[in-house]
Amino acid sequence: MGAHASVTDTNILSGLESNATGVTAFSMPGWQLALWATAYLALVLVAVTGNATVIWIILAHERMRTVTNYFIINLALADLCMAAFNATFNFIYASHNIWYFGSTFCYFQNLFPVTAMFVSIYSMTAIAADRYMAIVHPFQPRLSAPSTKAVIAVIWLVALALASPQCFYSTITVDQGATKCVVAWPNDNGGKMLLLYHLVVFVLIYFLPLVVMFAAYSVIGLTLWKRAVPRHQAHGANLRHLQAKKKFVKAMVLVVVTFAICWLPYHLYFILGTFQEDIYYRKFIQQVYLALFWLAMSSTMYNPIIYCCLNHRFRSGFRLAFRCCPWGTPTEEDRLELTHTPSISRRVNRCHTKETLFMTGDMTHSEATNGQVGGPQDGEPAGP
């Protein structure tokens, strides 16, 4: 995604790939560059640390290894990669207007970080679909561990396929002594191919996934808030179970809304720019791009914060992960949250448990047919 008229940076939706023939010198005062560098450094540190911690919390604690949380791992990994590669190298490129990293890394930067962006949005969509099936259709078969891994593999393959055109047409050019990593679209008279690619990507990785997630979470919300725990069960584990489901929906809706807000200005920047390319030659456009790019990349650091604030198990996990910090002292309750698996069936009789699991959408197909209560995955949600 191009920073300005003279540069085509290595993110998705490159602004001036094949049409950047002139060079405009973009420079900024040292203090301004230092401020931007500090802002991007803070973003990368928070995003990488937060998402790495989320991955550790889930993988290191068996209770957290649920179908939904495996998708959250995939989302966290994608966000971590976006922060480490997109935010870091594209900031250097956009702020200096020179590609320092060679031709091989130019291809890599136009493939892997772009793939990670696709994986991020599709992982959120998979989480919405999984929760939709679990809550709205609790008697339908749930994804098994092998099926979940297969879905994750398909997500990565589809993301690679969508990112491959930008990688395929990547090339290194030297313009007035400055090395550029550009995406040179073939036979792109009038920028029609560029605009088409922008629109296709916008629809496939922004508009359609958001529509699907909005519809799924709307139905989930209506389903959960319509159901009420019977009076004789309106306390203890059953009520906590329903409340946990509602908190999960709130957390994931916040994740989706945050993503939508962060990325919309960035997508519009490039779509609108195809209609008025001379704007990329304006001196101020570098600052506009750096601001919009920071906003888009900042979406990678918010999810761990949301999980920590809205889910007690992730909050306990963060305390354990940062137990060396003054504010991260874990308690015995925090350890139990991540290691102890309560048995709902010990608290209530089987038929009442079965009814409650149906209402909260956590009954698997085998439980519905055999009257069995499942393990950690099928009790109080371990996810956010």
Curated annotation (Swiss-Prot):
InterPro entries in the cross-refs: GPCR_Rhodpsn, GPCR_Rhodpsn_7TM, Neurokn_rcpt, NK2_rcpt
Region described as Disordered: spans on this chain: 365-384
Residues modified by glycosylation: N19
Gene3D superfamilies reported in the protein's UniProt record: Rhodopsin 7-helix transmembrane proteins
Lipid-substituted positions (S-palmitoyl cysteine): C324
Pfam families listed in its UniProt record: 7tm_1
GO biological process: intestine smooth muscle contraction; negative regulation of luteinizing hormone secretion; operant conditioning; positive regulation of acetylcholine secretion, neurotransmission; positive regulation of flagellated sperm motility; positive regulation of monoatomic ion transport; positive regulation of uterine smooth muscle contraction; positive regulation of vascular permeability
Membrane topology summary: Multi-pass membrane protein
Alphabetically ordered keywords of this record: Cell membrane, Disulfide bond, G-protein coupled receptor, Glycoprotein, Lipoprotein, Membrane, Palmitate, Receptor, Transducer, Transmembrane, Transmembrane helix
Protein name: Substance-K receptor
Biological source species: Mus musculus
Lineage: Eukaryota, Metazoa, Chordata, Craniata, Vertebrata
